[in-house]
Amino acid sequence: MVTVNEFRKAQRAEGPATVLAIGTATPPNCVDQSAYADYYFRITNSEDKPELKEKFRRMCEKSMINTRYMHLTEDLLKQNPSFCEYMASSLDARQDIVVNEVPKLGKEAALRAIKEWGRPKSKITHLIFCTTSGVDMPGADFRLTKLLGLRPSVKRFMMYQQGCFAGGTVLRLAKDLAENNKNARVLVVCSEITVITFRGPNDTHLDSLVGQALFGDGAGAVIVGSDPVIGIEKPLFEIVSAAQTILPDSDGAIDGHLREVGLTFHLLKDVPGLISKNIRKSLVEAFKPLGISDWNSIFWIAHPGGPAILDQVETELSLKPDKLKSTRQVLRDYGNMSSACVLFILDEMRNASAKDGHRTTGEGLDWGVLFGFGPGLTVETVVLHSVPT
């Protein structure tokens, strides 16, 4: 008869959790940021607010975003005029859309990850689904299981209303699942659409306008597992460690509240300062055990909450301009897609590394960091190790 310790040892994987495939998806509707102020004020019937429109135009210009993708088309907004008001009761109509569309967009990203992975869907043992766009029972994880045709016994985890830091959270959870369950293959999906947050402008709530200028729709998916099957599975990044912390003196810096009017966001101007002031401590705690203290010697995947956050992090840590290249590229092409962003940046980095002839998936470097920032202020710090391209 085996002992408990022997049984537990046999249950666990030998190697570190590894990202084995990545997939991304967006709605087909692409929005030109340079024309968005005119469109937004027209579709929300707010042309009588020229000064506010000019403020919003400047926000869009400073966002460093070129394009975003949105499920909400002009036709859909005309069918739901309450979405275009500032604070109209509209949650039912918003929910009717997101409970269907969030899993569907997640499915598109998941299928691309599964195709790259190259193994049967029946080998997926766990599913982690994350969204800040609506809530439902059974959840989006259940709907995605049905849409993909996963085994009914797949072990599901549903994360609602976590916000922008959760792209790090899902990797932290996937790491623990993969390393503590031998042969586990974890499908991770983050799917976000702005149907739940879109609303018209108001000059007393400028932080809401900031969100209207930054947020876009997208879904990212990864498959995580330990001990890759040689010749079948292709490792992309190893997940070495993961930590979460609440920043000091940051209560109320980023808040989100689900109300009859949808999901409202409240942001303090000091968010970039709070993050940049505390980021060094998170880096030291994560990399001191590895003997790393040069932040330019690692590759960077940082949630692009907005250009001000990235600029202040660069300044605080004296980062070279190219350190946040992949992060800024995703912000430029897609905007802030909340939890899905860092998965898009992972994809951008491994693709750019191969295209540019780097020796590893991490821009030729061995070690890297993935940061998630969001409500709390909460910070997720994930240490990654790249693999040869």
UniProtKB/Swiss-Prot annotation:
Question: Is Hydrolase given among the entry's keywords?
Answer: no
At the top level of its lineage, which domain of life is listed? Eukaryota
Entry's PROSITE patterns? CHALCONE_SYNTH
What's in the keyword line of the UniProt record?
A: Acyltransferase, Flavonoid biosynthesis, Transferase
Q: What is its EC number?
A: 2.3.1.74
* Xref: Gene3D superfamilies: 3.40.47.10
Question: What task does this protein carry out?
Answer: The primary product of this enzyme is 4,2',4',6'-tetrahydroxychalcone (also termed naringenin-chalcone or chalcone) which can under specific conditions spontaneously isomerize into naringenin.
The record's similarity note reads: Belongs to the thiolase-like superfamily. Chalcone/stilbene synthases family.
Q: What is this protein called?
A: Chalcone synthase 9
